[in-house]
């Protein structure tokens, strides 16, 4: 490996009275002793959403940095990975941290500089022990090491920033997920902030890559815009008052303008119509971003619709091979489990158990399906794996004659309690106002109010009077289908009835959720839940005996031995509940701005002749009207990730999913597909 070709690469440091490391070459400090940890954590870790993105990453997550300096940002990222792994029940995807440093510090300088950061001492010691123990002049061109049994890789390139990054290879999809533009300011270190550097940043960035930096210099902003970043200037912390946050909007998306979501100024206030799991997750995510929220719930109390069941199962919808549906639900599942764990750890308790879920292979078609899962091995074992009848019986703690597919990280919870506690967590921010017994029956657009910097607002008509919403999000489940502005969306209401059964000594030891054509949950408060029916074109939520009989019959038909052992009779029914699900055509939620159908047809009409026709025009949408709908029977799984996507759209923060998945969830996907299939004439 070649040596550094610079003749003066050593860095002379001095230390201020409080221990702050000071660089004589650039006449500036590396970080402040009192607030450096908090400042860097806020700008680079929090504003890039590193912790969340590490939890949901499917492939190696790559961070690139200009100016390694003392290694503070790397250690913060290492700490974020450690914390994310601690709250995760599965092995995180690997992390690769790449940093370019023209003037590296010696091991002795690192020891002294990092000694004033007690929050990072353990990780700092591990890092320093692996660092080159020789003069800077003898460093190679790069240094590599690993942490956490190889899960985290560090690549340090000792070179000029632009030159160092030019040595990296990447595919057309890009390499870097998040950028830390650190190093000293353009005024102090102008050579680093070159046009060549920004060209490399553009070349290496993935679609939706994020970037943060302390500098807000005009030159930097212009260069970032030129290479495709969307910018937002934010308040920083400590003595550094401002910062930049940016998201890459790359060329492949602009070839399909209908993939682009509308940009709005982050609203100070958002109104939500709902009361169940979707609105709870949306309210929580928005209030955590500093947005004030008013919730309008038609019922006298929360969680009275589809989220009102006593027990519900949380598990992903997976197919043998990875496809759009499976890809979304596996990511949504991990996000849901992380959020619900977070809520519980904050002290907002709800009945739940991570006991796993068993999909029983009770017939030949399901046996073949299980064999396909096992042979293809598409998914990691911690998500799903096959078990035989003996293993299934041990997992369930009851005798089962069949094997099946086991999801060890799945479980059950009380949706009703969970929803209320998520709302309580949102209320603890003091940014949530809840108005129950307020049924919004009509919404009407109000043009150009002076109070709304995003343009039009909405007038809401209810049984409690008129209200105004600057930005409106509709999460009202099946009720939303009746709102005039949403009738063009292909949503349907499907009735479902769940039956609660009294436990007995033959089934009370059940220790995992069982799925067949229906499902059977473990005992909670003396009951088990079985279900559920699926009835289209039926909006009557009055319970009936026929549906209870159906739920019991399905258990008997699919698992006759178990049903015979339990011996449930009609008198063992504790209660029943019927509610409506809001379903989409493709079994994926609808998240985002409501499309203007007429403008879509006018704008994208040539897709009917050439589906690959390139458009730069962003999707025309109805101003300030958003939905989080179509969660169907899987709201527990899909709501948290969908809420994160909605919040990213409203707050101009990085999306937690890629551009293709964004389109797969976009409310305009149906009209685009219909234009391509020539179902709609322009």
From Swiss-Prot:
Region (tRNA (mnm(5)s(2)U34)-methyltransferase): 1-249
EC number: 2.1.1.61, 1.5.-.-
Cofactor: FAD
GO biological process, one term: methylation
GO molecular function, one term: tRNA (5-methylaminomethyl-2-thiouridylate)(34)-methyltransferase activity
Subcellular location: Cytoplasm
One Pfam family linked to the record: DAO
Catalytic activity: 5-aminomethyl-2-thiouridine(34) in tRNA + S-adenosyl-L-methionine = 5-methylaminomethyl-2-thiouridine(34) in tRNA + S-adenosyl-L-homocysteine + H(+)
Top-rank taxon: Bacteria
Keywords: Cytoplasm, FAD, Flavoprotein, Methyltransferase, Multifunctional enzyme, Oxidoreductase, S-adenosyl-L-methionine, Transferase, tRNA processing
UniProt keyword Transferase present: yes
GO cellular component terms, A-Z: cytoplasm
Presence of keyword Repressor: no
Region (FAD-dependent cmnm(5)s(2)U34 oxidoreductase): 273-682
Chief location of this protein within or outside the cell: cytoplasm
Signal peptide segment: none
Function (record text): Catalyzes the last two steps in the biosynthesis of 5-methylaminomethyl-2-thiouridine (mnm(5)s(2)U) at the wobble position (U34) in tRNA. Catalyzes the FAD-dependent demodification of cmnm(5)s(2)U34 to nm(5)s(2)U34, followed by the transfer of a methyl group from S-adenosyl-L-methionine to nm(5)s(2)U34, to form mnm(5)s(2)U34.
Family: In the N-terminal section; belongs to the methyltransferase superfamily. tRNA (mnm(5)s(2)U34)-methyltransferase family.
Family annotation (NCBIfam families): MnmC_Cterm, PRK01747.1-2, tRNA_MNMC2
This protein's name: tRNA 5-methylaminomethyl-2-thiouridine biosynthesis bifunctional protein MnmC
Annotated organism of origin: Colwellia psychrerythraea (strain 34H / ATCC BAA-681)
Recorded name of the encoding gene: mnmC
């Amino acid at each position: 490996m070649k040596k550094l070709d610079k003749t003066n690469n050593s860095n002379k440091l001095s230390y201020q009275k409080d221990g702050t490391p000071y660089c004589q070459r650039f006449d500036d400090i590396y970080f402040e002793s009192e607030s450096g940890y908090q400042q860097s954590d806020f700008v680079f870790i929090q504003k890039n959403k590193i912790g969340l993105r590490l939890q949901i990453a499917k492939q190696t997550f790559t961070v690139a940095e200009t100016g390694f300096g003392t290694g503070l940002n790397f250690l913060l990222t290492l700490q974020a990975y450690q914390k994310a792994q601690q709250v995760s029940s599965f092995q995180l995807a690997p992390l690769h941290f790449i940093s370019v440093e023209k003037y590296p510090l010696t091991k002795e300088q690192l020891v002294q500089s990092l000694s004033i950061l007690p929050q990072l001492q353990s990780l700092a010691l591990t890092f320093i022990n692996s660092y080159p123990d020789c003069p800077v002049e003898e460093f190679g061109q790069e240094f590599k090491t690993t942490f956490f049994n190889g899960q985290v890789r560090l690549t340090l390139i000792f070179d000029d920033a632009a030159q160092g990054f030019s040595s990296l290879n990447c595919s057309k999809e890009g390499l870097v997920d998040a950028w830390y533009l650190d190093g000293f300011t353009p005024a102090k270190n102008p050579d680093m902030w070159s046009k060549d550097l920004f060209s490399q940043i553009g070349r290496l960035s993935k679609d939706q890559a994020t970037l943060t930096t302390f500098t807000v210099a005009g030159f930097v902003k212009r260069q970032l815009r030129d290479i495709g970043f969307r910018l937002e200037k934010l308040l920083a912390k400590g003595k550094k008052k401002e910062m930049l946050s940016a998201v890459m909007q790359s060329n492949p998306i602009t070839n399909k303008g209908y993939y682009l979501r509308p940009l709005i100024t982050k609203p100070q206030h958002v109104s939500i119509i709902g009361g169940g799991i979707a609105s709870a997750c949306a309210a929580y995510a928005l209030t955590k971003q500093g947005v004030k929220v008013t919730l309008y719930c038609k019922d006298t109390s929360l969680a009275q619709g589809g989220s009102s069941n006593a027990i519900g199962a949380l598990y992903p919808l997976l197919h043998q091979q990875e496809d759009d549906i499976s890809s979304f639900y596996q990511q949504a599942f991990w996000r849901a489990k992380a959020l619900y764990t977070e809520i519980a750890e904050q002290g907002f308790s709800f009945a739940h158990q991570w006991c796993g879920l068993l999909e029983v292979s009770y017939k030949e078609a399901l046996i073949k399906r299980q064999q396909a899962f096992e042979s293809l091995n598409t998914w990691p074992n911690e998500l799903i794996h096959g078990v035989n009848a003996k293993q299934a019986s041990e997992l369930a703690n009851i005798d089962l004659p069949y094997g099946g597919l086991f999801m060890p990280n799945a479980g059950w919870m009380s949706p009703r309690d969970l929803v209320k506690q998520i709302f309580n967590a949102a209320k603890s921010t003091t940014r949530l106002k809840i108005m129950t017994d307020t049924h919004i029956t009509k919404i009407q657009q109000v043009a150009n109010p002076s109070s709304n910097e995003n343009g039009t607002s909405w007038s809401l008509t209810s049984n409690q009077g008129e209200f105004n919403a600057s930005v409106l999000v509709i999460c009202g489940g099946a009720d939303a289908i009746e709102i005039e502005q949403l009738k063009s969306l292909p949503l349907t209401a499907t009735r479902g009835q769940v039956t609660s059964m009294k436990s007995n000594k033959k089934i009370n030891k059940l220790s995992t959720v069982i799925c067949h054509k229906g499902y059977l949950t473990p005992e909670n408060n003396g009951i088990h839940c079985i279900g559920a029916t699926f009835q289209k074109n039926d909006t009557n939520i009055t319970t009936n005996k026929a549906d209870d009989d159906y739920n019991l019959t399905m258990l008997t038909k699919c698992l006759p031995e178990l049903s015979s052992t339990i011996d449930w009779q009609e008198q063992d029914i504790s209660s029943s509940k019927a509610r409506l699900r809001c379903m989409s055509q493709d079994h994926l939620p609808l998240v985002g701005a409501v499309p203007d159908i007429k403008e879509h047809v006018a704008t994208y009409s040539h897709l009917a002749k050439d589906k690959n026709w390139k458009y730069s025009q962003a999707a025309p949408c109805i101003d300030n009207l958003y939905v989080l709908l179509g969660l169907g029977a899987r709201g527990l799984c899909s709501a948290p990730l969908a809420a994160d996507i909605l919040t990213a759209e409203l707050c101009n923060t990085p999306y937690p999913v890629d551009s293709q998945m964004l389109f797969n969830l976009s409310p305009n996907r149906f009209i685009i597909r219909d234009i391509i299939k020539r179902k709609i004439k322009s």
